[in-house]
Amino acid sequence: MNFNKLFVIVLLAALAFFGQAEAGGLKKFGKKLEGVGKRVFKASEKALPVVTGFKALGK
C-alpha cells in the first residue's frame, strides 16, 4: 500500500518537472537567431551573383 502511494507521488512529481514548460527566454532567443539567419541568407543571395560574375571576369 505504501509503495502505491509513493509511486503516485513520484509520478506526479515527475510530471510536474518534466511536463510542458514555457519557452520564455529561449523562444525570444530563437526568434532573434532566426532573424539573423534570414538576414545572412538574403545578403548572401544578393552577393553570390556578384562574386560569381567577378570570378568569371578573372578567368
From Swiss-Prot:
Coiled coil: none annotated. The keyword Repeat does not apply. The keyword ATP-binding does not apply. Keywords: Amidation, Antibiotic, Antimicrobial, Immunity, Innate immunity, Secreted, Signal. Residues 1-23 form the signal peptide. The gene is CECA. Pfam families: Cecropin. The modification Leucine amide is found at L57. Belongs to the cecropin family. Cecropins have lytic and antibacterial activity against several Gram-positive and Gram-negative bacteria. InterPro entries: Cecropin, Cecropin_insect. It is found in: Secreted. GO terms for biological process: antibacterial humoral response; defense response to Gram-negative bacterium; defense response to Gram-positive bacterium; innate immune response. This is Cecropin-A. One of its GO terms (cellular component) is extracellular space.
